[in-house]
Amino acid sequence: MKKSNGAALIPIYVFLVLYLGLGILFEYVLKIPMGFYNIPIVVAFMVAIFVACLQNRKVSFDEKLQIMANGLTDKNIITMLLIFLTAGIFVGVVGRSSAESVAYFMLSIIPARFSVAVLFVVACFVSTAMGTSVGTITLLTPIGVAVADASGFNLPLCVASIMGGAMFGDNLSFISDTTIAACNGQGCAMKDKFRANFWIAFPAAIVTLIVILVKSFNTEIGGVVQHDYNMIQIIPYVLVLIGGIAGVNVFVVLIVGIVSGSIIMLATGQTAAVDLLTNMGSGAAGMFETSMVAVLVAAMCSLIREYGGFEALLSAIKKVFKGDKGGQLGIGLLVGAMDIATANNTVAIVMANPIAKEMADDYGISPKRSASLLDTFSCIFQGIIPYGAQMLVAISAVSELGREISAFQIIPNLFYPILLLVSSLVWMLIRSKDKTHLAKRR
């Protein structure tokens, strides 16, 4: 075991000061729209890596390069990168029209009284199928505004219901970058993490649905939204969802989705062959920054681990959190703190992964449980911070339609993230240790 060295964590502090500090300056002082997302996160990590390279003069620069390279040779890192790109290609192939068909189909078969509840359920389904909360919010917020205008429901409630459903799907989806990052970082199968997550997320979703229905029955309603949809375009999402739940290899699931989506888009005339290839490239390109962040974090964390930074952090956490339940809470708060600082749940998970892995080993927490904790708590914090991408995208989408709404109007209606936190803490208290994992450790 390496000697504990708190100074080895300085690169993380440098990144947080750059990213969080400049984000606050841009967003709240200079009033730049979506200020946090004008900060080039790759540049911030490059500066942090440069600082890490300046530390520990006993290790030569060539040796530091080798240490960083060793961090990238992990099978989980390579798997994560390939899944990121494949998932991006899938989303590029099926496009927005397929997801719109999913949304409008579900809205068409439900009475107007339940339209806000349907928005929540649709967001859950679409986000689980698409693997992106931001994409789901971008897609469904205009529909939510239309529902509010046509039915008389409260606009913040409609938007918050979409955001809550989007975070549910982002947390559970097999092709979500948070799921990919958590599972590969902790070394567990996606189906195992899904099962662990499901029993935490599902009760929270059910209670959220009940709360929305209660509020809906206390509202005077008008008409209902009607729009054309294409049932055939729903097929790729359904196949991906079924394959993922059944535990089929994620690459097989995504390839089936890509092939079926390509055939359907070409057969229905939704896209030309040349455009289909372009869309594949655009979808993959959409994952480039996330992939590069994963690479840079792996390199930076390799140096921090070599310098003894993880030992220092683990030692500090162990002084506060005791036993299995304390370890679980420690992992949850660790990724939560990273998310508050970065306003990006995927980056938060990638940064927390190596530390959480060592914590899980020390506290006897199974990989599927630690992956579930990382994904769930990052989802909770990301779902309620007023400067997160999900909140900013929702507000921007509403503004583009000529309506005004603020984060502080939406937050009181964000029932799902709060109930997910309650469900997580309750599950943490009542569940027993994973006996299978403990037996393997012995």
Question: What name fits each language-model region?
Answer:
Residues D74-M80, Y104-V122, A148-C158, H227-I235, ...:
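Membrane-interfacial loop-to-helix junctions in multi-pass transporters
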Residues G164-M167, N171-H227, I232, G383-I384, ...:
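Juxtamembrane and boundary regions of transmembrane helices in multi-pass small-molecule transporters
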Residues M80-V91, P111-I143, K318-K357, D362-Y363, ...:
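Hydrophobic alpha-helical transmembrane segments of multi-pass integral membrane proteins
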Residues A7-G21, G35-R57, I78-T86, I232-G243, ...:
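Hydrophobic mid-bilayer segments of alpha-helices in multi-pass membrane transport proteins
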Residues R57-S60, T73-K75, G152-P156, A181-F194, ...:
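Juxtamembrane helix-boundary/capping and inter-helix hinge elements in multi-pass membrane proteins
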Residues K2-S4, E27-V42, N70-K75, L107-P111, ...:
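Interfacial loop-to-helix junctions that mark the boundaries of transmembrane helices
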Residues I83, R113-V126, G152-G169, G326-D339, ...:
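Alpha-helical transmembrane segments of multi-pass membrane proteins
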